[in-house]
Amino acid sequence: MAVRQWVIALALAALLVVDREVPVAAGKLPFSRMPICEHMVESPTCSQMSNLVCGTDGLTYTNECQLCLARIKTKQDIQIMKDGKC
């Protein structure tokens, strides 16, 4: 019985640790990813095909290419926070 209580206590402690907020260091979001923008040097035009991405700047972009254009124009390190709308 004591082992079972110990396992339950350990599981609850693990849940508390997992549920804690992840600190954001140096202004960087913990789950963002870098867009692939290398092709923008050769051809700075984007298709209008909709594949929404949410930028770390809080804006929704039509696609990853549009986010790359915004990175170039604003000279900001905009990354992809998630696929879809912000």
Swiss-Prot record:
Site (Reactive bond): Q48, M49
GO terms for MF: serine-type endopeptidase inhibitor activity
Cellular component GO terms, alphabetical: extracellular region
Signal sequence, renumbered to the chain: 1-26
GO BP: response to xenobiotic stimulus
Keyword terms of this UniProt record: Disulfide bond, Protease inhibitor, Secreted, Serine protease inhibitor, Signal
Protein known as: Serine protease inhibitor Kazal-type 4
Organism name: Homo sapiens
Designated gene of the protein: SPINK4
PROSITE patterns: KAZAL_1, KAZAL_2
Disulfide bond residue pairs: C37-C68, C46-C65, C54-C86
Domain Kazal-like: start-end pairs: 31-86
Pfam families according to UniProt: Kazal_1
Subcellular location(s) of the protein: Secreted
